[in-house]
Amino acid sequence: MSGSRTVTVDTIAGPTEVTGTPSRIVAFGQQWVDALIEFDVQPVGYVSAGSNGDERGLYPWQTEVADDSIMLDASAVDQVGGAVPTEQIASLQPDLILVSGIPSIDPYRGLSDIAPTIFPKAEKVETWESQIETLGRVLDREDDASRIIEEGHAVTDDIEQDYPGLDGKTAVLSQFVFDTQQLAVVADPEDGAAQVFGSIGLTVPQSLVDSPDISHGRIVLSPERLDVLTADLVVMLPNGGTREDLEKLPGFSGLPAASGGGVAVVDFATVVGFNTPSKASAEYSLNKIRPQLEAVAS
């Protein structure tokens, strides 16, 4: 940690003060790993994809993470009730810990005893732009933060120009969990996941926005409620199943998006790229669904 300046970051756990410029940063969550890489800052330790990633626990767009960055025990993201690797994090002697993509901050509160810890700002997915702005302040590199955000917006602006017919159309991000027979749908237009679609001219259907059942930016429904997926574009992960399994669900083939070529059945990495977006992951995932974007736009 160098310098004496102090930056205060408001989080769901209260304000976090970071004094000086941190140099040993632990990133818990794919969004923060990606944000650091945008600043050419390597995490000393990280949790990202866990068992859903490659041999280093990384997603396909995270190729620039250095070989000497330590992959931490990912039990907390791989298992319900998995332990946070507190001792492992402490052994790295971090001067800043970044946490995102967690269902509850309670198991992570003890990290603040190790180093200043930046938790999410609210109980929904933070936008990648907000995280870049936060890092810009903490690293005393606000000009770089503005440049990174402009670069990201240039990518989505280009996609919007490629498909002008998307303007005014609707989109939903969802997953069907076969083990529990539950449908999870992003319904809050202010959620970071929904804002990826918003950046290319798409909106969340108003019927979902008005739902009283939104929690953490999402609605969880039974399979009989597939009818809520009225959007022109439906991006869905068959969690624990296949596209063929989805097509067997009553009502799936009758979705408006199905007849219009707007159903994108995607893999885990692609849905994560939307669900907890970063500049890099949003570009990766949007490129994966270009055929559906073209169909919806036409």
Describe each PLM feature range.
Residues M1-V18, S298:
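Short, low-complexity disordered leader/linker segments with a strong preference
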